[in-house]
Amino acid sequence: MSKKALVLLWTAFAACAAMAQVEVTDAWVRATAQGQKATGAFMNLTAKKNTRLVGVKTEAAAVAEVHEMKMEKDVMRMQRIPSLELPAGKTVSLKPGSLHVMLMNLKEPLPVDSHVQLTLMFEDADGVKSQQDLHLMTTLKGPGADSKADGAHQHH
């Protein structure tokens, strides 16, 4: 086997291995009403080794960012975060009212039971970059949602 073929094979193997480094579960996007221009995507992320979520892309919105919500002087604030640490073996939950993927300037409404494709971009502790494509269903409440989560993204 030629040296070039070995390099290509190793690169393909490394990319596949890197893609499998983060398990995504319970992923969903909050459905929108007519005229609504923003919504959230939620999921649980579990990395096999220390990794960071460094970006999100989608065709459904002009802007896709990781956001966090936190209390500052009795006011709940939402802000973009440049990356999200995913410690090895620990599940990081992106959920309403907390960490989440914010989809802004939606190109069209996202009714219940429609599909949204997201691409998550990761970088592990060794600097290896990977991405993972997700096909998410839209719903009003995600798996295991309770009444406290209702409307958490209705005012963006």
For each feature predicted by the language model, list its residue ranges:
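Bacterial N-terminal signal peptides that target proteins for export
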Residues: 1-9
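Intrinsically disordered, low-complexity repeat segments enriched in small/polar residues
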Residues: 6-7, 14, 49
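A ubiquitous, low-specificity "background" feature that marks scattered single residues
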Residues: 9-10, 74
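N-terminal signal peptide c-region/cleavage motif recognized by signal peptidases
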Residues: 12-19
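Compact, glycine-rich, soluble single-domain proteins
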Residues: 21-156
